[in-house]
Structures are given as C-alpha cells and as structure tokens.
From Swiss-Prot:
This is DNA ligase. The gene is ligA. DNA ligase that catalyzes the formation of phosphodiester linkages between 5'-phosphoryl and 3'-hydroxyl groups in double-stranded DNA using NAD as a coenzyme and as the energy source for the reaction. It is essential for DNA replication and repair of damaged DNA. The active site is at K116 (n6-amp-lysine intermediate). Its cofactor is Mg(2+); Mn(2+). One of its GO terms (biological process) is DNA repair. It catalyses: NAD(+) + (deoxyribonucleotide)n-3'-hydroxyl + 5'-phospho-(deoxyribonucleotide)m = (deoxyribonucleotide)n+m + AMP + beta-nicotinamide D-nucleotide. Zn(2+) binds at C405, C408, C423, C428. GO terms for molecular function: DNA binding; DNA ligase (NAD+) activity; metal ion binding. Its EC number is 6.5.1.2. It is an enzyme of class 6 (ligase). Gene3D superfamilies: 5' to 3' exonuclease, C-terminal subdomain, 6.20.10.30, BRCT domain, DNA ligase/mRNA capping enzyme, Helix hairpin bin, Nucleic acid-binding proteins.
C-alpha cells in the first residue's frame, strides 16, 4: 500500500470510528456491531503503526490507552471550579428562590434543572476544536492533569465539530452495569472491591496507566461551558444545546422551569425515577438560566449565588453493632466509632459509623450487640441514629469509655465546656501520626504522594517524628518501604523539596494550631507577612485583627510560647522552608484608589504582556469584577489581539474599549 493510499485510508477509518463512537456513547444509538467496530479499530491501529508519520493526537486509536505516567502534574484552572451551596428540603429551595429574586429586584427568573451526577468533576480544554488537556477539580483552584486517561473515555470528543477554543466542564462517571461487572472481576481475582460507582470512577481516572482507565468503560456528561472565545451565549440552556452540537454528551433529562413550584415538582419526579437510571445521581442542580442574571447575582468565595444543589434525603438502614473502636485525633480527642455488620446504605458498603462521644453513647443507651439505625447522606460520615430496643435479647454489653489513652496509656481528661475526652500527652504517637497526615494534606503543605499509608509506613519505620523530619528524608530511606521504586522515591523527594516554596498560610495551617483553620491561617499570613512577626504577636494584637476571636488569639500565643515549637521553626529555617507570605495583599490593594474599583470588566483576545488569568487576578485585587460576556452592565472591555465578537457587543452597548497598552498604563499607576 502506497503512503498516499495509507494516509487516505487512515483518515477514512478515523472519521468512521469517530462517528461510531458518537452514535454509541453520546446518542446511545449504535449503528454497527461490536465486531465491525473492533475490525475497523484494529485496521487503524495496524496502519498507524506501519505509518507513524501519520499519527495524530486526536486519533480514536489513542482511546485504548497510552504511555504509563510517573506522576500527575498540577493544573491551575483558568476560572475556579466552585462548589455549590446545598438545599435539603422544599424550604431551602424556596429560600434560594427568594434570595435570587431579591438579588435581581424580582426580575423574571427562569431556572434550569439538571440531574446531579455522582461522579468526578473534570474540566476539558480545547484549542481550535482539538482536545488538548483535561484536569480534575482538585480544590477548585488547582487540579491534576489527567489528559491521557480522559482520552480513553469515548463520550469525550477528541475533535469538536467546530474549530473553537473553549473549556467545558462535566462529570465523569461509571455506569452501574460497568460497576457491577468490575467488582465481579475484582472479587474473582481476590482484590478489594470498590464501595460505589463514584469511587470506582475516581480510582480509574487517577490510574497512572491509561490502559487501566481504558478498560473501565467510563462515560461523561458535560454540564457547563466555562470559557469560550469569541462567542456570547445568553443562557445556560442554550450553552448546553451548543455543547451537544459540538459533539459532547449532555444529559437529556434537563428541564427549564418558570417557577419554584415547577422546580420542586422536577425534584420530586426524579427522586422517584432515580433507581431506574443506569448511573448514580445524588441530587438535582438548579441554576438561573439567564447568563446576564447569573453575572448580576455573582458568587461568594465558595459558591455561585445563582445555583444550588438539592441533595436527596439521607438513607437509613438497620444493622447490628458488633463493637466499638477508639481513635485518637491530632488534637488528642478520643473518638468512639461503631463497628457494624456490613450493610449497603446510600450506594456504599458501610462497616463503621460515628458515635461522636461518650455522652451520645449514654444518651442513646447504645450497647455492643444492639441493632441500630444507621444514616448516611452523600459524603457525610455514617452515624448511628438510634437503637432498636425491641430487638434486644439481654445479651448486649454496656460500653464504658476508658480512663487512659488507647495509644499511649496517658490519663484522659475532659476540658472545661467540652464533651470529648482528650489525651494531653504531647508525645502521644497517635496524635503525632495524625498531625503529620494533616501537615502534608492538600490544604496544608500539599505534598504529592504523601498520604496516610506512606506517613504510617514512615512513622512505623521511625523515619519521622516531627514535621521537620520530612525534610531530611532520603531516597534510600524511601526505597526501604513497601511499594516504593526508584521513580516513586525520586518523585516524592522532589515533591517534599517543592513544598519548601509554599506560601506562609499553608505552613501555618499545616502546623495544626488549635482553632486555626485554613481561612484564619491566610488572615494571619497576610497580616503579619512573616512567621517571625506572628511569633512575636501579643494576644491583643491578634484580637485586633478582623474575625480573630479571643479563643483563637489565646491558642496562637500559647502555641508559640513553647520551646519545642520554636525549635521546630528553627529546623524549618535550616532546611530552607519558606516562612513568608507570597500572596497578593488584598487589604493593601483595596486601600489604593483604583479605576477598577466597583467596575465590571470583560477581557477578550490575546494579551501579550500578561495572560488573561493574571489580568483577572489584578483587576479583582483592585476591587473590580471580571465577567465572561458583554452586557449593558459592563463598564470596560480590554481587547487584546484577535478580540472578535465582543468588540461588536461593546459597541452595541456603548461600552468603553481599551487596548492592552492602555490597560497596563492604568495597572501601573
């Protein structure tokens, strides 16, 4: 076969297989048998192997899985992947409707309701119609690059029907039938099964070997358009229609509703229909449909004001409590946990449930051997609601909390105004281990590859006892641990080294100072700028900071008034751990008189000197708001190269337009 004929046949096969994929995985209407599909795929794979110069990144053959990865790279989202506020009953939905109408002066509101798929949120980036990158949601700001695994999902188009640059967001999931089949295979192989389809989807997508993901038969529904160049779409429902036209799989069960009564009826309808779907849903997402109204309502730090997620009611089941286990947290709190006969609840096999504290056990008269009601909703930890007293036989055992710590044998105490028993031994191994797990966690030092399992191994091997010990770990030590090879050990040492460059707020949160959460840690870091300045702060100086109360101030002062802590900080310095704040000082910028304060700005086209993401951050730091489309409420359009249709929209609405040079002049004043 000549090169010219081979190239033509390769292109024919790609078009044919892309059509077959779309019909089967998006339209759910296959036109050929599996055998015919496989025959065409094998022919394509063979021709591409014989003619590697014709290989393409968007070939359907890529979906069988590519090269094994060493690590998932971090990806910063162009715009945050915000979580949604929750509604749990009809009253919550009506409150949401009232807030929306108040926020837009009772303008006519149309809602769009969609099924809330219980999977893994991901973003998909396309340039000129080609899929170039996919990422997990992560913490909403930073996710992980899972491009190669997403390419194995046949519901995700590798090439769109238009040469458009955009970001789509959606939910990757595992169909129920695929989940059942996968667990059957795992059981036959003597492997641990997945608890639910969501965990199976997440575990499959985060495999370093894309071939594993390719075998798992994952799918995806796209639910939103986050960034699209040169196109203004006035409503969310129209954006979903547009995504469908481009070749994405969108959920067909969405509905627009003119009133909150229609929304409630939709929720009730799908609560009944839910079991008949071949994928898990855990609620309904309700959004204001009009994009201009969405922009008018805006967002809070965590979630948009124009959307809410209705969560289906918690599921309750009865099972037998077979024992009570104690755990010691990083602050010394001793928590009892019920051990249960395994039972399926809310799509998950549950073997343990929270008992909270000793008072709850006494109040509910919970005994070992009791039949109890267990409740679970979504990701919430299962809890024991009450005892079925009618099922008691007289053989049940009363439970009494111990007087000494199960980890270190120190006497337990109950501090004033607390219900929990607490171990106050600073050398308690359980507290130290839990503290280390917290220190490396995502919102703290965020050390990739250092999870609970590895921390436990390092702790048991006596390689680490303090936070600073992490920075003395060597590759040779890691190679002594189970499941560590040359690459994984090298990657972890590098990840630990990279964490030295974190901004101060991450280190502060990681230290686990009592009462200091992630938000307070950022407040302290921004206010004092250096660890040394914070260490010297008095209780009065701390309380003078907005939102810092007496308990937190006292806790911070007490923490740093400790020789062991000061020694730890000195060790951090010696290892080169950054202890200064690297973020934007929003408080300072808000005091600067700025043109952007209170203004609504649209960025369009390519900015040469700084990216649009950086420009957005600077405008927001100076009190402005950046939106994605031009409307009559827009104050300014900043137009870079190839600005396109937004210039026409600016002219239509009589909005001022700046080029990049003028924009930079204003920023640098």
């Amino acid at each position: 076969m000549s090169k010219e004929i081979a190239k033509k046949r390769i292109e024919e096969l790609r078009d044919l297989l892309n059509t077959f994929n779309y019909q089967y995985h998006v339209l759910d209407n296959p036109s050929v048998s599996d055998a015919e599909y496989d025959r065409n795929m094998q022919e394509l794979i063979k021709l591409e192997a014989e003619n590697p110069e014709f290989m393409s990144e968007d070939s359907p053959s890529i979906r069988v899985g590519g090269t094994v990865l060493d690590i998932f790279e971090k990806v910063t989202h162009k715009s945050p992947m915000l979580s949604l506020g929750n509604a749990f009953n009809e009253g919550d939905l009506r409150d949401f409707d009232r807030r929306v109408r108040q926020g837009i002066d009772d303008a006519n509101v149309r809602y769009i309701c969609e099924l809330k798929i219980d999977g893994l949120a991901v973003s998909l980036h396309y340039e000129k119609g080609r899929f170039i990158q996919g990422a997990t949601r992560g913490d909403g700001v930073t996710g992980e690059d899972i491009t190669q695994n997403l390419k194995t999902i046949k519901a995700i188009p590798l090439r769109l029907n238009e040469e458009v640059t955009l970001e789509a967001r959606g939910e990757a999931y595992m169909p129920k039938r695929s989940f059942v089949k996968l667990n059957e295979e795992k059981e036959q192989n003597g492997e641990d099964v997945f608890a639910n389809p969501r965990n199976a989807a997440a575990g499959s997508i985060r495999q370093l070997d894309p071939k594993i993901a390719a075998k798992r038969n994952l799918s995806m529904f796209v639910y939103g358009l986050a960034n699209v160049e040169e196109k203004t779409i006035p409503s969310h429902s129209e954006s979903l229609d547009y995504l469908g036209e481009l070749g994405f799989k969108t959920n067909p069960n969405r509905r627009t509703c003119e009133t909150i009564e229609e929304v409630i009826a939709y929720v009730e309808e799908w609560q009944e229909k839910r079991p008949h779907l071949d994928y898990e849903i855990d609620g309904i997402v309700i959004k204001v449909d009009d994009v201009a109204l969405q922009e008018s309502l805006g967002t809070t730090a965590k979630s948009p004001r124009w959307a809410i997620a209705y969560k289906f009611p918690a599921e309750e089941v009865v099972t037998r409590l077979t024992g009570i286990e104690l755990s010691v947290g990083r602050t010394g709190v001793v928590t009892p946990t019920a051990e249960l006969e395994p039972v399926r609840v809310a799509g998950t096999i549950v073997r343990r449930a929270s008992l909270h504290n000793e008072d709850l056990i006494r109040e509910k008269d919970i005994r070992i051997g009791d039949y109890v009601v267990v409740k679970k909703a979504g990701d919430i930890i299962p809890e024991v609601i009450n005892v079925i007293f009618d099922k008691r036989t007289g053989g049940e055992e009363e439970y009494h909390m111990p007087t000494h710590c199960p980890a270190c044998e120190s006497e337990l105490v109950r501090l004033e105004e607390e219900v929990a028993l607490r171990c106050i031994n600073p050398t308690c191994p359980a507290q130290i281990r839990e503290g280390l797990i917290h220190f490396v966690s995502r919102n703290a030092m965020n050390i990739d590859g250092l999870g609970e399992r590895v921390i436990t191994q390092l702790f048991d091997a006596d390689y680490i006892r303090t936070f600073a010990d992490l920075y003395s770990l060597t590759k040779e030590q890691l190679l002594q641990l189970e499941r560590f090879g040359e690459k994984s050990a090298t990657n972890l040492v590098q990840a630990i080294e990279n964490s030295k460059e974190n901004s101060l707020e991450r280190l502060l949160f990681g230290l686990g100072i009592r009462h200091v959460g992630a938000k307070a840690a950022r407040t302290f870091a921004e206010h004092f700028e250096t660890m040394d300045a914070l260490v010297k702060a008095t209780e009065e100086e701390l309380k003078a900071i907005n939102e810092i109360g007496e308990k937190m101030a006292q806790s911070v002062v007490a923490y740093f008034d400790n020789e062991d802590v000061l020694e730890l900080l000195q060790q951090f310095k010696e290892y080169g751990v950054n202890m200064t704040y690297k973020g934007i000082k929003i408080a300072d910028l808000q005091n600067v008189e700025s043109y952007f304060a209170g203004k609504t700005v649209v960025l369009t086209g390519k900015l040469e000197v700084m990216g649009r993401s950086e420009a957005k951050k600077k405008i927001e730091a100076l009190g402005g708001k950046v939106t994605g489309s031009v409307s009559k409420s827009t104050d300014l359009v900043v137009a870079g190269e190839a600005a396109g249709s937004k210039l026409a929209q600016a002219e239509k609405h009589n909005v001022e337009v700046w080029n990049e040079e003028r924009f930079l002049q204003e920023l640098n004043k």
